Amino acid sequence: MRNAQKPSGMPIHRYLPFQDQITVEVPDRTWPDKVITKAPRWCAVDLRDGNQALIDPMSPARKLKMFQLLVKMGYKEIEVGFPSASQTDFDFVRQLIEGGHIPDDVSIQVLTQAREHLIERTYESLVGAKQAIVHLYNSTSVLQRRVVFNQDEDGILDIALQGARLCKKYEETLTDTHITYEYSPESFTGTELEYAARVCNAIADVFEASADKQVIINLPATVEMATPNVYADSIEWMHRNLHPREGIIISLHPHNDRGTGVAAAELGYLAGADRIEGCLFGNGERTGNVDLVTLGLNMFVQGVDPMIDFSDIDEIRRTVEYCNQLPVPERSPYGGDLVFTAFSGSHQDAIKKGFEALEKDAAAAGKSVDDFTWQVPYLPIDPKDLGRSYEAVIRVNSQSGKGGVAYLLKNEHNLDLPRRAQIEFSGVIQRRTDAVGGEVSGAQLWQIFQDEYLPSDEEQAQWGRYGLGSVSTETDESGAMTMNANLRIDGVEVRRTGHGNGPIAALLDILHHDGVDVRVLDYSEHALSEGGSASAAAYVECAVGERVLWGVGIDPSTTTSSLKALISAVNRAVRDAQA
């Protein structure tokens, strides 16, 4: 087949391929052969990196609510601000410490640039904290060395070293606080690897990195510049060239400029990283920081404990939306409104069958569904494990088929329609959505079903020729049944008698004597719930004249439900003939 694409005409000559800017060569890379088997150390940066990207930065009350959410979820390292950059951030750090909001096993993290007055102010903010991470950074990229700082490699290294030495100096003022150091060569992805390692190793020496006194070396994709595999290669290269490796915690801080922040974090973790920084639902500058929700739940669905509690995803989302004053998109992985919703007919049918198979397999294994291995088509995770219901799993629009319609009827009303009845009713829904457009809600679906198959007694006279009243039967020794039925025919109350080998056959006899050409082709029934007092649902497929169609009946009596189903089919045929 010929490719008909044509050149875009866009100014591609203005952009340089990444490989022409930075060399990343790891021909003996090992990360592609690895799999994730345990969670990394997490650091949530919503209160600093996320907050600085908001149109309306968080108020102190919203900041505290976000901090409390992160603690509740299980994050043990939380970046809480840039206390030397604003009085607001300084005051919030003091509020957390003085207000006793920091659990003993949680380390707050604060950011600072490599300038003395900023570092001094940073340490002032930490007085009284049990433990803290001081995060020092300066930009090292080729571009920023040239256009921002006008410095060569040695000049940028001197800035970093001066900052590290000042941190050590002011650490002496915090005798009751355990300090862990973190250093970021900001814009790492735009920095030559050899130079990045030179700077990081020099900083690790100043901070006296060792197995007993580990230093966090954070390698941010401050701007995502290449494909995730390139980022992973750069992390593996650094993993091999940072010293002493046992004294280094390699941390990742991916952004999402190319839309692959999650993939970059996962591959970078495979490549030797120990820790990942990010934000809930991917908030952050430009296209955002890596999404901690997606990362954590990607591990969960592979059977790896993320060490973070996502079991009430809607509450997490509501809190994040309140604090950030930004909506979480409907398609945001795991947390969006539509991520567990299927509109497609084939998807709905597969999901319906998947639920049925899951129940069957769990019962065969002697386990509850909630404790059985989750395998349902199109649903990589059980919504219930995130605190969601199944209500939104299947929704009906013009793209939906019988599977989705049948699922909603069974899940919400315990009606298990035979397959051909599913096909028939999905056609009714299809005609409705084609004519009106939009989505059909669960309540609307049920109303359409009732109008089509289960009119109330008051409505029967309006569209149905026949109404079923009281019925009595007698069976002789040969098994033949005589039925006396009170019917409403064209609005007139009448009493009719019929004979047959059962209730349906006897009612058919009555209808035949009234001139109705009807034959029963198929019949099924089931209880609507467990217990002796449960109502029954009956489904009767009939040939009425030239039409083949279904009737449905619901009644506490199984016999009456089957008779109602037969009347339903006949009435539908009469209504269609009159339409």
Curated annotation (Swiss-Prot):
Its cofactor is Mg(2+). The keyword Signal does not apply. It is found in: Cytoplasm. Keywords: Amino-acid biosynthesis, Branched-chain amino acid biosynthesis, Cytoplasm, Leucine biosynthesis, Magnesium, Metal-binding, Transferase. It catalyses: 3-methyl-2-oxobutanoate + acetyl-CoA + H2O = (2S)-2-isopropylmalate + CoA + H(+). One of its GO terms (molecular function) is 2-isopropylmalate synthase activity. It holds the Pfam family HMGL-like. InterPro entries: 2-isopropylmalate_synth_dimer, AIPM/Hcit_synth_CS, Aldolase_TIM, IPM_Synthase, LeuA-like_post-cat, LeuA_allosteric_dom_sf, LeuA_N_DRE-TIM, PYR_CT. Gene3D superfamilies: 3.30.160.270, Aldolase class I. Residues 456-579 are annotated as: Regulatory domain. Pathway: Amino-acid biosynthesis; L-leucine biosynthesis; L-leucine from 3-methyl-2-oxobutanoate: step 1/4. It is an enzyme of class 2 (transferase). Its EC number is 2.3.3.13. Mg(2+) binds at residues 49, 253, 255, 289. One of its GO terms (cellular component) is cytoplasm. GO terms for biological process: L-leucine biosynthetic process. Residues 40-314 form the Pyruvate carboxyltransferase domain. Belongs to the alpha-IPM synthase/homocitrate synthase family. LeuA type 2 subfamily. Homodimer. Catalyzes the condensation of the acetyl group of acetyl-CoA with 3-methyl-2-oxobutanoate (2-ketoisovalerate) to form 3-carboxy-3-hydroxy-4-methylpentanoate (2-isopropylmalate). PANTHER family: 2-ISOPROPYLMALATE SYNTHASE (PTHR46911:SF1), PTHR46911. This is 2-isopropylmalate synthase.
